[in-house]
């Protein structure tokens, strides 16, 4: 069972809880979602609790993360977008931490679960809709009407824009889920090659060198992907929030 590359993604109950026929069990996914949030909050707290004029390593990382997301928001949604800084920064840190924790052996990668990434995507799109209608009323619907479109093409373009908007939570969630899933499966397969060949003795050890090199290279690549996927999620969030702040601006 452990040789199955998809076994690492199975949801397993830790504390079974059932109320009124509804399963509220505490699972490995629940544990590592809580762990991801706790690690992110804990790191930021300890990194900034003893702030110094000349920052140490942890304070530098925390400040760089803050400035990174702040600049991203200003570029993607303008200065008004800074009101959403807590949301975007929290999402970025959670996704990044969850991705990185999933790189450790026997740890669970919560971002490889479509239900988790879809919930995050729904949070983003829900925020866009709620703020858009709250701030602009029905003028928010201008987001579906690009400027400069000939009247004869307007119905078709509006239909395309609506479909594109409705597909955003799907594309946002599937992109993160698929990349993390595929990367971890590939790592598991190459690591399995190394273990299987190594068990054959001296001849197998020689043949395991190439898969081992590939595994090390893929591990390094997966750490890069872990950051890039958090970055892409945050960038797209900023772009979608820009539609809520400036509807009809495209």
Swiss-Prot record:
Alphabetical list of Pfam families matching this protein: ATP-synt_A
Signal peptide feature range: none
Keyword Ubl conjugation: no
Membrane topology of the entry: Multi-pass membrane protein
GO cellular component: plasma membrane; proton-transporting ATP synthase complex
Alphabetized UniProt keyword annotations: ATP synthesis, Cell inner membrane, Cell membrane, CF(0), Hydrogen ion transport, Ion transport, Membrane, Transmembrane, Transmembrane helix, Transport
GO MF annotation: an example: proton-transporting ATP synthase activity, rotational mechanism
Oligomer and partners: F-type ATPases have 2 components, CF(1) - the catalytic core - and CF(0) - the membrane proton channel. CF(1) has five subunits: alpha(3), beta(3), gamma(1), delta(1), epsilon(1). CF(0) has three main subunits: a(1), b(2) and c(9-12). The alpha and beta chains form an alternating ring which encloses part of the gamma chain. CF(1) is attached to CF(0) by a central stalk formed by the gamma and epsilon chains, while a peripheral stalk is formed by the delta and b chains.
The name this protein goes by in its record: ATP synthase subunit a
Underlying gene: atpB
